[in-house]
Amino acid sequence: NLVRTVFGNWGVVGQPGSKGPRGAWINDNNGYIGDVSPIIGVEVSANDTSGNPLTFHSVVVTPADRPNLGGFEESPTGKFWGFEPVSGYLNETQERVAISTDPNTWPPYWPDKLNESDDSGWSGKWNGYFGKDIQNIQQESYFLMDDNNDEEFNHSQYNNLGVAFHPDSLNLSRNGLGLKMAVRGMQWQQFLAQDCIFWVYEVKNESTTDYKKAVFGMLVGTYIGVTSTEDRGEYDDDWSFFDVNDDITYTGDFDNDVSRNPKWDGDVGMVGYAFLESPGNPFDGIDNDGDYQELEGAPFAPLFEESNFDSTLINVGQIVILIDSDYLRTEYTIPDLDTVEVITGGEKILIIPGETYLSEGNPIELSNNIEGANINAFDGIDNDLDGLIDENYFLHYRQRRVDQNGTILFDIINPRAYIDYISGLGIDNPLIDEARDDNIDNDGDWDMEYDDIGADGIPDTQDIGENDGQPTHGEPNFDETDVDESDQIGLTSFDYFTPAGDYPMKHDEQLWEKLKPGFFDTPSSIQNGVPIAGEDGDFIYGSGFFPLRAGQTERFSVALVYGKDLEGLIN
């Protein structure tokens, strides 16, 4: 593999710069990144200390050593508020992250495997993505982080909202949002994979709180030409952009000249950050990833039409769909009353039969004569009582992206499939609202001949599920081991900022706005998709919204990929 990088078990790739190459390709002195790290944002409904209900946003960051606006995310006493490593996942007598090729880095046992009845803790065995001691990945690293240190909204004296939010009603000492993130880095030497590192993130909501709206993001500090911790100024002529169709963001050096770094060897090239798996939404009734026809013989499902986004008059006797807190749908017939109050998704909707019109995600005029979707397409509620949550004209029918200046980035008619909860069409299609924890082989690719090898993922060990003729968790091509069993959302936001210090690390609401779906802030140095200048700029990209319920795990994976030019990068 041609990629080398330093990283830490606090979630930052490319740091500390003094410890090794910083996202280097081909040559260890050919560094491409200053810092790359995950971000998780969540909308929280809670009460302040006076009992008044309110909604706020908490965005959990990593301790990236980088310029920012207003200082680091930390307490008044200097305690970092964000993701920090979970202990027990490396050999504490040395400093390296646990890595598959070096047993000396492994812990005495793996805390997340203590409940394995046949081999508690997997002592002396690698905790692999594909199962116990399976090392068919050339090199694999593994660590865990959680947000227990992020106490900003757990104690009212730390925030200006007067909030003392406790995410876990069963453990009031649990701080943050109750999130834990497992992180794996993966590399292969094969020709097709030699120019990338794969990063796999699993975020679990360990709290007792259901979050209706969450968003995943990545912060990318660009620095083509970096070697270690020196400051040769090579960060001031980079350019960055994105391709929503291919779910990739990328960075190049404008003049293709990094001669200020005398250690650089060879051509400059480019670096990209590609979603291989984005978070999924298995609750909205919509085929977000457009794969509803990929299973042979899959039941019919309707496609969105323009008329689906017209306002609908609600009349007496009309059947509507109500959604409970577990996302179960029930039919409800509008009674012959002057006013009718219904509850869906925990929200009250008042209806005057024969007068009330309902709509969701319909086109409206936003500021500066820019047309966009009704803001109710982003609230996690079924506002028009059709059983679909947050349908969006500009996402699920006419897929259009517009930047902050009103420039259309692309605009195509590409309707998504959905479930018609009144007629029942689409409800039996396993590739609409598929999930990696629904106990279903949604895409039908589990093969009894090859995959029926048991929960440990290893053949011929006679463990649970082996040769029982049905899929078992831990076996290949089923639920958590099958990326395709997720109704993926893809790239939904991109925020470019310059200078690189314009990163509001400690300002949760500002970060939330940058991560919101539909926010595409493109650099002025890009015209018609082509760079006209280089500068010192970094970016944040996001994928959301999706529900993150208590006990739920969402997965996403990113490839840090390199190429000589944009075509080579994408290919």
What are these regions (language model features)?
Residues N1-N571:
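A long-range scaffold signal marking pre-active-site subdomains of enzyme folds
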